Amino acid sequence: EKTLYSFADEVVMYSDIPAGDNEIIARIGDADAVLLSYTSQINRYILERCPNVRYIGMCCSLYSPESANVDIRYANERGITVTGIRDYGDEGVIEYVVSELVRCLHGFGQKPWEGIPREITGLKVGIVGLGKSGGMIADAMKFFGADIAYYARSEKKEAGAKGYRFMPLNELLTWSEVVCCCLNKNTVLLHEAEFKALGNRKILFNTGLSPAWDESSFTRWLEEDNLCFCDTLGALGSTALLTHPHVRCMQVSTGRTRQAFDRLSEKVLANLSEYNG
């Protein structure tokens, strides 16, 4: 926070979430730059009423204009620079996946998944989306002795060098005992055919910010002997599913750790420094 004063003559901080667009407009006022949390959005309506804005720093992940909480295309038309960050909260998410999977397999605080405790050793783990977090989950599972395969938009040489097998999506789903979906926000890959390929007696993790499935197909799959883990309601999709006996949703963002906030702050300030030259 103190470092921000080296970039501007005046800094105004708000610690609460604005109630709506008009409150955001009032808060921005005649500011040249805006720093924005993931909890709020800056749309075209807001930007049209804040003509002085020249820079928007997203203090959250930016993967694509479609998934952003800023109307990036309109901002670019106006000559407004929009920056975002990535890869600041992955470590906590990986720890969550390992922790919940170990508890499930061993039966810590619950019945063991296979009736008797088992290790991750030899477990068939499929990763859907081998980006930064997906790759880290794959590496963690490999460390514990799992057999790793993955689906991504293209085969990755570095993954092959580690012994990870590239598979078509439906083949991967059928092969896997545990599937981890690590996709960008609003990316939906699991529909009726995919859940049919996945089959029953499977464990599904979703570490994304939104559901990786269409809800009707997912709900039917849950009715069988399957289990789904999500850390947040955003990843699960529907409050009605929170009480489903085959859903484990903590409603806590596992990537929001002390270290993640440090990494986030450093990256936001680095973007500001680059913008200022």
Regions found by a protein language model. Give the residues of each.
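Phosphate-coordination loops involved in phosphoryl transfer and adenosine-cofactor binding
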Residues: 53, 121-124, 201
